Structures are given as C-alpha cells and as structure tokens.
Amino acid sequence: MPVRRRTVLSAVASTALAALALTGCTQDPLAAEFRAGDNKRYIAGDGTFTEVRLADRAAPVDFSGTLADGTEITSADYRGSVTVVNFWYAECPPCRLEAKDLQAASEEHAPDGVKFLGVNTRDQAPNVDSFDSTYGITYPSVLDVEDTSMQLAFAGTIAPNAVPATIVLDRQGRVASRVLGQIDPGVLRTLVSDTVAEPAG
C-alpha cells in the first residue's frame, strides 16, 4: 500500500487555497488529481489526506441544500457535531468502492454523535435512492447537481465537480481534515476520532 502523505495546513496555506478557488483552483492539489483522471470525472487520487491544526482553521463553512427526500438542511443542523461530508455520484467507480466503508464508519462513530452527510454532484433523487439501497447507505445526501450550492460553499477545500472527496468538520463547522480520492477506512477512523477528541467550544 502506498504511503499516504500527512500534512498540516498553516493559516497562510488555508488562505491560499481559498484564493485559488476564486481563480478556478488551477493549482489546487485536488484539481490536479481530477485532471489526472483523464476526464473520467472522478479523482485519480490515492487517498492523500490533510489535517488542519485547531489554531489554523478557517471560519465555519456555511451551507444549505435539499436532501434526496426533499428535506431542506443548513449547516446549523450540524453545528455542535463532528460531521463527515462526502462528495460523490453514482457512476463514480471510487465512490462505489468506498460506499460501504463510509456506511460502516457512520455506524461506528454514531455513539460519539458524529453525523455523516453525502453531497451528490450529478444525480437526481431516484439514482441516489437506488445507490443507497444497493450499498445500504442510511445517512442522507444533498442533491447538488442543479445549483451546486454545496460545492460553492466548500470552494477552496474541494475542486468543483471533483469526486470523491471527504471533509471532516469539527463541532464549530470548520474544516478539520480532508481526504482526496477513495478513503482508507483506517485513515478516516483516525481523522474522525482525532476531531471527536478535541475539546468542545
């Protein structure tokens, strides 16, 4: 298994990521991984992950969207809970490969109050429902294909339309870590557990 790079973003690096988002994310590592996928529309990433130190985290991410069942949600619904946000779509091969691992992680961390939220970037509700049924997914997904509001909310953290990508938000709604490409269950467990263990407030 290739060794995964573990880096810590400084406040300067976080600001740079946000600036790159406004210019098309041309130098963002995630965008580079996306381009390496030869236009397959999914990341050729290797599960590289980044953690952000508490002192270097940017402002909370404010987001809103509509779930596949029509329910409206906002970031306020997730404040106070460590939240795992996974960007995906049904025909993305790495997304299918990681689906059961994400579901298992959601069950494992549920006793700690961790919430999971999918963000589907290409499909309509019937496709999302079919995918969830096939892979046993029980956590909800936002339909983001029409207005891309979730992708815009996370601009600077992920590249537009690049999937899969997984973001861990701390209890304040700030980005604590991200994984580019298919998750490694052990890595995700560590990222989530580290964030859960942080002092509240």
Spans of model-derived segments:
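A short beta-strand-turn-helix
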Residues: 53-83
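N-terminal targeting signals for export/organelle localization
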Residues: 1-62, 201
